[in-house]
Amino acid sequence: MLGGGLVGLAILFFVLALIFAILGARGVAGMSMSVAKWLVIIFIVLAIISLLL
């Protein structure tokens, strides 16, 4: 997988969103961007928590 873990999934969903946006599937692109955004937020929160512990 691309980078593994949450970052890899976020990158995957971001790329899917770009592809679907180019193809004109706005609903799928928006959903993919939403998933990618939440994965990045979760990754950042977990990274901060792991740095503090």
Curated annotation (Swiss-Prot):
Keywords: Cell membrane, Membrane, Transmembrane, Transmembrane helix. Its main location: membrane. It is found in: Cell membrane. GO terms for cellular component: plasma membrane. It is a multi-pass membrane protein. The chain crosses the membrane at residues 5-25, 33-53. InterPro entries: DUF1328. Belongs to the UPF0391 family. This is UPF0391 membrane protein Memar_0049. It comes from Methanoculleus marisnigri (strain ATCC 35101 / DSM 1498 / JR1).
